[in-house]
């Protein structure tokens, strides 16, 4: 990097000058409005380019806070949320982690009711391991290279278990396709045959978008998130003290609900560019530090990883305990970081949080995995899932330049609307087929020769006037926190 070793006074002065210059430019950048930052950002790039290797597109990550003059949603929206919670209590199975369930079974087969140090249980050599790190694939041994290993075979058989929920969806899907319908509706009478379940949600965050905010509101439900419900907004705490106070209130409710346990924040910095997600104020009393230092001043007591033991009660419930404090530990991860490819302990603690309090969103299930078109799903004026198209590369001739007329004919045949979203994980790219430059972007995506998922764009209606400024109306996403009294 461009900061030099501080062997003498001149080097120290150079480092101080560099840091002060960087701080000055960052402050100047904050003062400018969104459209006037380019020259300052270029100066930052030039300053850092002196001996530092970095990706220019990912160097800076920015959060923006716009002061809201007034923010109100009516009781009609909260009533719709109540209906959504009722829907999931009857209809949709919870999103259990297959990795976590497999770990429970393998742990109980090996240790039964024993209480084992967590670092031992998750060690792929002496214990079981976790996720991609197990006793079968945790290490790379040159003596085994070239030998077949079924545990490393990433091909899998899709589970086609035809549950009552799947059977209902098949019936409605086939009716919609036969009649050429763009959506299916799930009715209360459809839910009568399903047993109501406790959703295990002491508190939760509801993610939604308001599509119309009148007497009969229409919303797009993104999901109901359990576990550490502050994870969705914690990275924005530093922007406003009101947000920080709100997150603190959420975290305190966790401690009240688990009053006989230790609620501990997991603190881990797994890789570069994750610091902006992981580093945030935290008012929890306890913290679990894993390959990181306790950088937050708020955590008063640190629980070392080697102080934690694990057991699986009757092969069902995973229990973590502190040997020193002789109490059960409830780990919390108040960030939205994807931990699937993390180290075993970090991935395990994250999955444990999600199993302690479930999350819910509509899922078509594996039976519909490869369908080229899935209609919109609605329940009680709530869009549970937008319409979706799966585009395979072989739908277009290879080595041929696709022109606009051919693309338009294909779009009409597939009944794809003018405005859609290309979705890749959590990322979405807006495409309007009436805009030539956006059509070119769409064609460039097709040339990448990978399957593309398209999703209908739902914000075109003139009724969407929830978020307004001098520039006009905007799309919106709301996060509403709920808790049991």
Where in this protein do the model-derived segments appear?
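Type-3 copper protein
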Residues: 4-276, 317-323, 420-485
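Long C-terminal appendages of very large multidomain proteins
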Residues: 262, 272-274, 278-302, 306-485
């Amino acid at each position: 990097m461009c900061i030099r070793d501080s062997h003498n006074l001149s080097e120290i002065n150079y480092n101080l000058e560099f840091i002060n210059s960087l701080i000055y430019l960052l402050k100047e950048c904050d003062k400018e409005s969104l459209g006037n930052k380019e020259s300052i950002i270029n100066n930052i790039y030039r300053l850092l380019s002196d001996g530092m290797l970095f990706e220019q597109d990912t160097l800076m990550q920015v959060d923006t806070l716009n002061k809201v003059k007034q923010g109100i949603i009516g009781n009609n929206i909260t009533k719709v949320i109540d209906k959504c919670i009722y829907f999931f209590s009857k209809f949709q199975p919870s999103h259990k982690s297959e990795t976590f369930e497999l770990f429970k079974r393998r742990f109980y087969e090996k240790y039964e009711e024993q209480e084992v140090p967590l670092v031992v249980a998750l060690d792929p050599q002496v214990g079981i391991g976790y996720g991609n790190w197990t006793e079968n694939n945790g290490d790379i041994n040159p003596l085994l290279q070239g030998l077949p290993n079924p545990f490393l075979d990433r091909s899998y058989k899709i589970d086609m278990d035809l549950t009552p929920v799947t059977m209902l969806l098949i019936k409605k899907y086939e009716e919609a396709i036969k009649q050429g319908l763009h959506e299916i509706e799930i009715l209360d009478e459809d839910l009568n045959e399903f047993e109501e379940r406790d959703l295990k949600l002491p508190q939760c965050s509801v993610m939604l978008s308001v599509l119309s905010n009148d007497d009969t509101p229409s919303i797009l439900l993104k999901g109901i998130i359990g576990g550490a419900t502050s994870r969705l907004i914690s990275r924005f705490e530093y922007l406003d003290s009101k947000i920080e106070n709100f997150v603190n209130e959420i975290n305190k409710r966790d401690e009240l609900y688990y009053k006989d346990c230790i609620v501990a924040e997991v603190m881990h910095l797994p890789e570069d560019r994750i610091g902006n997600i992981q580093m945030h104020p935290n008012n929890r009393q306890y913290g679990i530090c894993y390959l990181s230092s306790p950088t937050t001043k708020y955590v008063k007591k640190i629980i070392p990883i080697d102080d934690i033991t694990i057991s699986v009660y009757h092969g069902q419930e995973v229990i973590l305990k502190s040997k020193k404090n002789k109490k059960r530990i409830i780990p919390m991860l108040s960030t939205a970081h994807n931990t699937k490819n993390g180290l075993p302990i970090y991935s395990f603690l994250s999955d444990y949080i999600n199993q302690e309090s479930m999350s819910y969103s509509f899922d078509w299930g594996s039976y519909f995995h490869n369908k080229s078109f899935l209609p919109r799903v609605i329940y009680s004026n709530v869009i549970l899932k937008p319409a979706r198209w799966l585009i395979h590369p072989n739908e277009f001739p290879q080595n041929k330049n696709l022109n606009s007329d051919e693309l338009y004919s294909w779009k009409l045949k597939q009944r794809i609307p003018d405005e859609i979203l290309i979705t890749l994980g959590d990322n979405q790219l807006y495409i309007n087929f009436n805009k030539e430059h956006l059509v070119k972007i769409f064609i460039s995506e097709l040339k990448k020769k990978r399957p593309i998922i398209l999703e209908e764009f739902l914000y075109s209606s003139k009724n969407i006037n929830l978020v307004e400024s001098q520039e006009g109306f905007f799309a919106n996403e709301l996060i509403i926190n709920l808790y049991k009294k």
